[in-house]
Amino acid sequence: MDGQHMVRGQLALRAMGVQGIPVVNVENACASASTALHMAVQHVRSGAADIVLAVGAEKMCIDDKARMFAAFDGAWDVHDTEAGKERLLAMGHGIAPPPGSQSLRPYSLFMDVYAAMGCMHMREFGTTQQQFAAVAAKNHGHSAHNPLAQYREAISVEQVLAAPPISYPLTLPMCSPVSDGAAAAIVCNESGLKCLQGDARRAVRVLACVLQTGSERASNDLENHLVRKAAHRLYEQSGV
């Protein structure tokens, strides 16, 4: 949010003494951190390094809400914005939002996109708003046990449904909050693990890690959905 776009990693890590090694800054929308992890895995598997640190960080909380939400404007084709929005929102056609189910306060347009995806799921599979609420309640239930979670209060399905509406079928607890936070993963081979004096019993083995982008398709053509395609590649590589 402060315009530090080009050398974030170099500047953030230098104060901790991390310098003189390759640092790659990754921007890939909501997949930025997982893309960094994918690159780390490939780097180690190629033999280019024994140890790679993959860091995901986000800094979104500022007082200027308009500027904060404007940060998402570059997450689609800025030269064809309206057509892109229209195409995405069309996924929800056929499901009429009940009266009072849309927020009158400003929020990210991506909530409308996710709501359209939810409406498409309702139309195609008979999914209910209560089932979406059950997912949110389950996730908030898990966060109550995580001391590092942004929100740590358990919430019932009924409370999720009674919460302020955002964009039907989504209510506030179903939506991603604006956050400041970070996470990191150390990716290494056996030599790297020994160098770090790590406990092999705690190490998580990466069987497969794939990265895939979407392709032109009808919104209800789920056979060619990028998640399905990526999952099949993942299962093939991992032998699961």
Q: Where is each model-derived feature located?
A:
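Beta-strand segments within the central parallel beta-sheet cores of soluble alpha/beta enzyme folds
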Residues: 1, 22-28, 52-56, 130-137, ...
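Conserved catalytic cysteine-centered active-site region
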Residues: 2-51, 59-114, 151-177, 207-209, ...
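Generic structural marker for isolated residues within well-ordered, non-membrane alpha-helices
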Residues: 9, 118, 231
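Active-site-proximal alpha-helical scaffold in enzymes
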Residues: 28-58, 111-145, 185-191
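Short acidic, glycine/serine/threonine-rich loops at helix termini
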Residues: 63-69, 144-147, 198, 217-219
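Condensing-enzyme catalytic core mediating Claisen C-C bond formation in acyl metabolism
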Residues: 86-104, 134, 165-233, 237
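Phosphate/pyrophosphate-binding loops at sites that engage ATP/ADP/AMP, CoA/4′-phosphopantetheine
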Residues: 121-126, 230-240
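ATPase catalytic-site recognition across NTP-hydrolyzing enzymes
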Residues: 139-140, 144-152, 158
